[in-house]
Swiss-Prot record:
Involved in the import of serine and threonine into the cell, with the concomitant import of sodium (symport system). One of its GO terms (cellular component) is plasma membrane. The keyword rRNA processing does not apply. One of its GO terms (biological process) is threonine transport. It is found in: Cell inner membrane. It is a multi-pass membrane protein. PANTHER family: PROTON/GLUTAMATE-ASPARTATE SYMPORTER (PTHR42865), SERINE_THREONINE TRANSPORTER SSTT (PTHR42865:SF8). This is Serine/threonine transporter SstT. It catalyses: L-serine(in) + Na(+)(in) = L-serine(out) + Na(+)(out); L-threonine(in) + Na(+)(in) = L-threonine(out) + Na(+)(out).
Length: 414
């Protein structure tokens, strides 16, 4: 096989098919690495795992710069008086997150789950009140712009890019062209990085399955079934209903496209931030309004947290059922609201949704000791829970953005 054919095989054709091939090869390497270790003298899965580490690192590195220039260029070049769809998208984000939490409450009662609490996890850094979560968000907004980029504080990056973009709307055309050229240049770099996704998935799958395997999840089958089942129900029932409300036609082709193109990558990177470039590429292919998606997708990565709301709710109710506590409907409804609010701030908390479990548990008087043990359970099942949560969160960002953009096209065509 010559070099050009090898390059064509590895980097051209359907990205989804190439990612699927990387997934299968990763599973194969994970299965054979242990038997081969004595023969070759090293763990093959650990060695190829560096490909996944490099891929995720590259995505996370380019994401802040991409957001900064893309949002700033889009707003600076936006004609004054042009209608914005951001209000409708934010409403969908918040509504989708609340409905996900509410569905999780129902699932938690229909399928009550108990877990064995034995291990403890440090919860000292967990926020103690909703106000603390909101305060963290405010601090992230007013962060130094260079610090926000260096530390990948996406709320801060978004705030500064929006501010500068609006301020530069009256700048000269030459300045606006420079911003657009920078945004285009970063987008091309993103395209190159995404072309390496099959290698990244290959490394991530091989290392993850070899390191933890699926044996560690055996004791939490019911909890995982309720968690993942609720997330799938949200992705394929709740979200399509919201999308149909906007586009007034069969939502499933769009839903499936977003799950396939965005959700699969997010599942393996386990990072909404790292998946922002993937979502922006998908939005381009869907021919969505750049001025809309360049803002809504980074924003969604920070506040559109249906998966996190489900995780917080299900694990909190698992603690409730394990302790044999009685919960009223009003308390459950309050849990939905608190979980949705906490989820929106999950991106501003180290450890994400898991470290917000003590906050939700405090609604029912559950001790920090028990809540900390639930965090430990979350880390054990994280190999599937965190991956599925991220896939739901990230794919919904581009899904809701597309729904609102398509609604606008439908209204303009009418």
């Amino acid at each position: 096989m010559n070099t050009s054919r090898l390059f064509s095989l590895l980097f051209q054709g359907s990205l989804v098919k190439r990612i699927a091939a990387g997934l299968v090869l990763g599973i194969v390497v994970a299965l054979i690495s242990a038997p081969l270790q004595e023969t070759i003298g090293f763990n093959l899965a650990e060695k190829v795992g560096v490909l996944g580490t490099i891929f995720v690192k590259a995505l996370r590195a380019v994401a802040p710069i991409l957001i900064f220039f893309l949002v700033m260029a889009a707003l600076a070049n936006r004609k004054i008086g042009t209608k914005s769809n951001m209000k409708e998208i934010i409403v969908l984000y918040l509504l989708g997150t609340f409905l996900a939490a509410f569905v999780a409450v129902i699932a938690g009662f229909v399928f009550p789950t108990e877990v064995v609490l034995a291990t403890k996890e440090d919860a000292s850094s967990a926020p103690q009140a909703v106000g603390q979560v909101l305060f963290t968000l405010i601090l992230n907004v007013v962060d130094n712009p260079l610090n926000a980029i260096f530390k990948a504080n996406f709320i801060g990056v978004l705030a500064w890019s929006i501010g500068l973009g609006l301020a530069l709307r009256h700048a000269s055309d030459a300045t606006k062209n420079v911003l657009s050229d920078f945004a285009e240049g970063v987008s091309k770099i993103v395209h190159v990085i995404i072309s390496f996704a099959p290698f990244g998935v290959f490394g991530l799958v091989a290392e993850t399955l070899s390191d933890k395997g699926l044996v560690a999840l055996g004791g939490y089958v019911q909890l995982l079934a309720v968690l993942i089942g609720t997330m799938l129900f949200t992705a394929f029932v709740v979200n399509p209903i919201l999308v149909y409300w906007k586009i007034r036609r069969n939502p499933y082709p769009l839903v499936w496209t977003c799950v396939r193109e965005s959700g699969v990558t997010a599942f393996f990177t386990r990072s909404s931030a790292a998946n922002i470039p993937v979502n922006i590429e998908l939005a381009k292919r869907l021919n969505l309004d750049e001025e809309t998606y360049s803002v809504s997708i980074p924003l969604g990565a920070n506040i559109n947290m249906a998966g996190a709301a489900i995780t917080i709710t299900i694990l909190t109710l698992a603690a409730v059922h394990t302790l044999g506590l009685e919960v009223s409907f009003v308390s459950a409804l309050l849990l939905s609201i608190v979980a949705a609010l906490c989820a929106c701030g999950a991106s501003g908390v180290a450890g994400g949704s898991l470290l917000l479990i003590p906050l939700a548990c405090s609604l029912f008087g559950i001790s920090d000791d028990v809540a900390a043990q639930m965090i430990g359970v979350g880390f054990i099942i994280g190999i599937l829970q965190d991956s599925t949560e991220t896939a739901l969160n990230s794919s919904t960002d581009v899904l809701f953005t597309a729904a609102v953009c398509m609604e606008e096209e439908r209204k303009n065509a009418a």
